[in-house]
Amino acid sequence: PDRHWYGNLPEILLEKRGGGVDAMIKKIDQAARTYPYSDSYTIWPGPNSNTFIAWISRAVPELQLDLPPTAIGKDYLNPWFFSRAPSGSGYQFSLFGLLGILVSPIEGFELNFLGLTFGFDLDPLAIKLPVIGRKNFSPPASSLYALD
């Protein structure tokens, strides 16, 4: 990560290594080249930088990226109303990023209202709230196996 964004420390959302990474890089490059809003930017409700990352993630489902609930613009699907979830593991309905619903094994259940995300996730158990983001109540199941 590079620098603070509105006083917040940057965080790494995803890191991939090993076999298949070169193929993912090619798919990411292709998705970036076909991004339909490269000449457009609107802070709210999108398209914006979060819309771009969600576009890439949908095009490369192997990333299984779970964007944070604070990523306003991730739900902007215009002109489409129905799409895969950004993680590629579920589905999403959205009216111009202003009103929508997302259901996915990776992202959980999310309601989007005026670009703000409300929801919950089961692995790890968490609640998702606007401004606050994600509040985990338990560690991911995958990390429990690391304790053995």
Residue ranges with predicted function:
Residues T42, E62-F81:
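Catalytic cysteine-centered active-site loop
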Residues N48-S49, I72-K74, L98-G100:
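Solvent-exposed loop/turn segments at secondary-structure junctions
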Residues N50-L63:
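Non-catalytic, well-ordered alpha-helical segments in soluble enzyme domains
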